[in-house]
Design a protein with these regions (language model features):
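Non-transmembrane, aqueous-exposed alpha-helical and coiled segments at domain scale
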Residues: 1-346
């Protein structure tokens, strides 16, 4: 509202879990305890919140609407955490009465937006309207299919859209995957194509690659087509959106990874399931021609330099997925709708 953005259409699932003050403290304590083995979380309490959800100790949006239930649930959630939270015993954020009062106030402010969002989405679908589900993080951070334990606490893969939204798998018509023209990662974990030195610094500066939540500089590397093909498979992508193609302008050659070599010298054209193997692979890089042109004003595929089109075609052919949208700058209008023309066929 302060930014003059209407929130009239905002609806929040009554079943959505809340990150509570004690989750933040637990997240920080957990990372500090791991020391050099830390996962590199955002320390925003996400992991402990999911842990409470699995333990049936979570606080949900609907709980904010009943002070008595809220108090009982917060008290029950705090009980098994007393020992871990002992160093923070005097932290005012852990005062039960104050916490209940604060979150009941939130409930009063948000009550008009809390709804059965599953029913709402189903009604829109039944009426023939378009419903878009947007995932967060990425496939390689999926708790089941990603680079465990260096992952998030949920399932960002496409299949989880049904679980999170409460609609059925048959309601999903298209699945678009989004990938940068290079690879970034925040925090620890394997990164076969990681770059260091001046080139990494240049790409990071061009792409403004700093964590949205933490502000930490992102690790950066060449596009990993082995990992991207794996992501395309587990998400059954129907189209690919490639962003930040403009960041590669001025580089020649531009490299992509098409295979790994294991520590034992074996060539791997698939994403290895064993983390020990993944942590010790080296990338097989293919050099593609670069381009010098500023592509920020391009709005059709034909306006792109030949080398830039060749880069997109190489990626699409390798993945077997058509490119539907290309980002050529930070502006919302700096996109090429390849699907409107004819998607670059995979």
């Amino acid at each position: 509202r302060r930014r003059r953005v209407s929130v009239d259409g905002l609806r929040i699932s009554a079943n959505a879990h809340l990150i509570m003050p004690y989750h933040l403290l637990l997240d920080l304590a957990g990372e500090q305890k791991l020391g050099k083995l830390e996962i590199g979380t955002t320390r925003r309490g996400i992991g402990p919140c999911y842990a409470d959800k699995a333990a049936r100790l979570g606080i949900r949006m609907q709980d904010l609407l009943d002070p008595k239930i809220l108090r009982k649930k917060i008290s029950a959630a705090l009980e098994p955490k007393r020992l871990t939270l002992r160093p923070h015993a005097k932290d005012p954020r852990l005062d039960l009465h104050a916490m209940v009062e604060e979150y009941v106030t939130y409930g009063h402010r948000l009550e008009q937006y809390i709804a059965d969002t599953s029913r709402l989405a189903t009604e829109y679908l039944d009426a023939g309207r378009t419903v878009l589900f947007e995932g967060a993080q990425g496939a390689m951070l999926d708790i089941d299919h990603g680079t465990y334990p260096f992952v998030t606490s949920s399932n960002p893969v496409a299949g989880a859209a049904c679980i999170g939204s409460g609609v059925g798998p048959k309601d999903i018509d298209e699945i678009w995957g989004i990938a940068k023209a290079y690879v970034t990662r925040v925090g620890a974990g394997p990164f076969p194509t990681e770059l260091e030195g001046e080139l990494a610094d240049e790409l990071r500066a061009r792409g403004r690659e700093y964590g949205t939540t933490t502000g930490r500089p992102r690790r950066i590397g060449w596009l990993d087509l082995v990992a991207l093909r794996y992501a395309a498979r587990i998400n059954t992508l129907t189209a690919l959106v490639m962003t930040k193609l403009d960041v590669l302008s001025g580089l020649d050659p531009v490299c992509v990874c098409t295979a790994y070599r294991s520590a034992e010298g074996a060539d791997l054209d698939h994403f290895p399931y064993h983390q020990t193997v993944l942590h010790h692979v080296t990338p097989h890089l293919v050099e593609l021609p670069g381009w010098d042109d500023d592509i920020g004003d391009c709005r059709t595929l034909d306006e792109l330099p030949e080398a830039a089109r060749g880069y997109l075609e190489f990626v699409s052919e390798f993945l077997g997925v058509p490119v539907a949208l290309v980002g050529v700058g930070p502006g919302r209008d700096q996109v090429i709708w390849a699907r409107r023309e004819a998607a670059i066929a995979g």
